[in-house]
Amino acid sequence: MELSDANLQTLTEYLKKTLDPDPAIRRPAEKFLESVEGNQNYPLLLLTLLEKSQDNVIKVCASVTFKNYIKRNWRIVEDEPNKICEADRVAIKANIVHLMLSSPEQIQKQLSDAISIIGREDFPQKWPDLLTEMVNRFQSGDFHVINGVLRTAHSLFKRYRHEFKSNELWTEIKLVLDAFALPLTNLFKATIELCSTHANDASALRILFSSLILISKLFYSLNFQDLPEFFEDNMETWMNNFHTLLTLDNKLLQTDDEEEAGLLELLKSQICDNAALYAQKYDEEFQRYLPRFVTAIWNLLVTTGQEVKYDLLVSNAIQFLASVCERPHYKNLFEDQNTLTSICEKVIVPNMEFRAADEEAFEDNSEEYIRRDLEGSDIDTRRRAACDLVRGLCKFFEGPVTGIFSGYVNSMLQEYAKNPSVNWKHKDAAIYLVTSLASKAQTQKHGITQANELVNLTEFFVNHILPDLKSANVNEFPVLKADGIKYITIFRNQVPKEHLLVSIPLLINHLQAESIVVHTYAAHALERLFTMRGPNSATLFTAAEIAPFVEILLTNLFKALTLPGSSENEYIMKAIMRSFSLLQEAIIPYIPTLITQLTQKLLAVSKNPSKPHFNHYMFEAICLSIRITCKSNPAAVVNFEEALFLVFTEILQNDVQEFIPYVFQVMSLLLETHKNDIPSSYMALFPHLLQPVLWERTGNIPALVRLLQAFLERGSNTIASAAADKIPGLLGVFQKLIASKANDHQGFYLLNSIIEHMPPESVDQYRKQIFILLFQRLQNSKTTKFIKSFLVFINLYCIKYGALALQEIFDGIQPKMFGMVLEKIIIPEIQKVSGNVEKKICAVGITKLLTECPPMMDTEYTKLWTPLLQSLIGLFELPEDDTIPDEEHFIDIEDTPGYQTAFSQLAFAGKKEHDPVGQMVNNPKIHLAQSLHKLSTACPGRVPSMVSTSLNAEALQYLQGYLQAASVTLL
């Protein structure tokens, strides 16, 4: 694409269309942009539009499109073509910083994100002048430019907070510190001076405080991994100024908005984070500053209001106290009884109250409320911070703290009892306080794993939780109902089983509650209870114990999906999946009705898939329905095909990318259920599965390979006779997969199925070419994963076609190649093979090479016979060699570029481990002994001589053990 006015005009028109609400106009425009984004100059055209276009909407659209383009395409993925040509990459890096800094803020943010994406890949090695260019802009004095630099630096450096320590990371941080720490410190001091100069200028202060927030965030990122020498030397400057800012109160920066945090609150929040970081990680160096910060933050807490805009500030301030009180160094600051009482009264209890804003979120923004309360994303809430502070104080003062707070709990419950309809918030706070007190350690998966023994959880459950849940009106006091259900979920490992069993029908009843939070919590609680394990690792609750409630459970779960706001509720669908899994055969009578409802739901959500977890659990539930029913009645598979195939066809025809990998997995499960040949409905699909476009999406690959394997397992003869012209296409797929380091193992899965199941004559003409392709890949790019897969394949080939056939095909490609493969690959690398089935295949294959390949006994290959036997005994007896060369450590990590749908494995569509050797060989060691005995009878005297003269003593001892176990000898 040329950088021409005509192309700019065309691009403008298509960008306009991508904003059209009508899908008939929008989607073709999106498809067009996708189709041209591989062309040279495409990204430069977008950047040119940012400079030249007069239409601000188009400029914003171009900036978002550019950022998403960079996100999808900048990373260079090994084995895949470079999606952006080098000239475009150079031009982008040369222009983007200047363009970003000269753009309005809305566009600046998009370009800043794009720079951070590029920087993540290219900085510092491929973009060494980025920092210099950014730091030089600090001299401009223009805070629009300076804030653009700071925002970009923050995007670039914030990953230092999450990266694992490594020499490479520390080298990069040191490079950044050398270039950036001093200019940042000078800018910090200069900005604070300007704040004093412009103390009465509200608009100037807003810009300056935006800078201070970004500077404080950068301080956090640059200090997170370790305390840099520069910041240790300049701690006085930073901490004194942080303390000053923490105590600052400028009326010009106060906002009337009760919801949105202002600049002053955001800055103080970040300073609390910075102080907490130093208190936790660098307490020795920070010790002399700590008392001043404790005092300042305490004063902040007792003087800050309950408005939502202060939530982040208050939670960060409390988190600071929590991090301090957990450190043995600072224990003395909290041990006084009056201090503990004061903290409880002035900080913890007020911040555990259920405010009007919380009530509003509970009723009107339930999804966000659930995300915060149930999923642990409440990290910046007052309640979560107060809970963490209770936990921190209990570390050293469990007895006194429990005593003080128990008094508050009793008092709150008494207030509630006086007038429940008015005082229900007191009980809510009491439940939360008990939860905080009792929870010493907690995980998402298991609930509370360590509890405060001073709190009687069962007694509290019986007296204060159960009565609320037993109330006939499921819609009364919804917040308390949600609290009670959450209590069961959190303390499920502490409350005795008999009480949990009593709770199950109550929870089922609450699936009918109108409140989204209540019926969601009920579904979540049931799902968690159904996954609990008893002492023998079986589920704590048996299908028989839940049997009395099966019908009402299933009815209420599916009805809950029809309640307003819960049509795609992932917790309900997960509970449906878990109920199916627990109840097994008990659900069979209901499946005809349930599969209809699931299919209708699938059709509805396929129009616009927006809830990935819901969709995943829905497909899991479909798989469970198939598995459970067809286990006792395989013929019922036809009913599922009738119910599902119309919807599946629509999904495939409409190219619903999110669902296609799931559809293939369910189809594999259905096809594998057929015991005889492949039905014609599947064979009609077979040619379409080989289309290259399907294989372009990495998320499709595992599911497609599994489906092709199912075709080969169930219908290899049909494919050989009715679709022989498709075999080259099948091998073309294999060729594409083995060329990729990320997907070569999938190529071998497919190849192994072809070798195992296809009639030999149907692949005869392709065999040599298959081996040539494998040797080319070995030569060009040998990885441990590839070697392991290659070893399994050649041994499977040996089992299927015979040892002599393997030797002949190798030597047919190149004379003496068989010996090279033995010497360079099989003997030295066999120890790396892992997995019971894989080891068994290799053991049986190598046994065949040792005992059924005449050239091994009477040619130049004979010298390799004993080393091969030694390596096989090593495979049996030595630990697996799991060493991986340094440069390969990350090859196996599947990195899905850009926005491509990642593959999500359906647990209940899982394929049983297939053993191609099967009953033919039960014990490979005995099989080796018997095969060696048979060989020794054919050529008496040779085998004992070769074994006794060349095998090492330890291996010989193991071999004698195998011979004894098989009751045979070598003649």
UniProtKB/Swiss-Prot annotation:
Top-rank taxon, per record: Eukaryota
GO BP terms in the entry: protein export from nucleus; protein import into nucleus
Positions bearing Phosphoserine: S112, S931
Modified sites of kind N6-acetyllysine: K574, K824
Keyword Cytoplasm: yes
A GO-annotated cellular component: cytosol
Gene Ontology molecular-function annotations: nuclear export signal receptor activity; small GTPase binding
Keywords of this entry: Acetylation, Cytoplasm, Nucleus, Phosphoprotein, Protein transport, Transport
Domain Importin N-terminal: 29-102
InterPro entries cross-referenced by the UniProt entry: ARM-like (IPR011989), ARM-type_fold (IPR016024), Importin-beta_N (IPR001494), XPO2_C (IPR005043), XPO2_central (IPR013713)
A Pfam family this chain is assigned to: Cse1
Tagged with keyword Iron-sulfur: no
Quaternary state and interactors: Found in a complex with CSE1L/XPO2, Ran and KPNA2. Binds with high affinity to importin-alpha only in the presence of RanGTP. The complex is dissociated by the combined action of RanBP1 and RanGAP1. Interacts with CFTR.
Family according to the record: Belongs to the XPO2/CSE1 family.
Identification of the protein by name: Exportin-2
Organism annotation: Bos taurus
Taxonomic lineage: Eukaryota, Metazoa, Chordata, Craniata, Vertebrata
